[in-house]
């Protein structure tokens, strides 16, 4: 299946739209300014771009152990990091991918744990703050929080399925072929997990937050599960 990461704020806050580079500049430990890497100087969104709100940057972030944080690092911090910053890291003999993902620790980005309910409560009480979490949690709390657009696109079921939403990711299910016929029930479990009643559009996994695969990709996945073929869904 798939998941999308929402960059959310209180429903009472004005609508917002950010690019990946703007989000990277808001969160990164170091950014490029005038061709040099410096400690992040941005205190307000408008410091990054005059078109953004004249409000203090306040972002609740997931901890480094979180899968959501890992996906955010890849899809936002990695993609939003500028070519200039990457070149400067490379020239310094540092791994750009790792350095670009480092987040600031000066109070503008605050770790909020992995309790999404607590994050929603904090966003509701502070309309100027933002936080990121899975799309399903956004839907479940749509009366309290809403998503900012990312590069002009709002998170949606279809947008996550076809990856037109910029912060969408595939979710993988791994089975070791050597265990088939050795570990009791594993093949039956694989068949159940990939059945329509499980991961289909109206399956029980969709009801608890999974964004189902598009029909063509579901057919490929289901066939591979039944035939025990290795596939790579993109």
Positions of predicted regions on the chain:
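Flexible loop/hinge segments at secondary-structure junctions
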Residues: 1-234
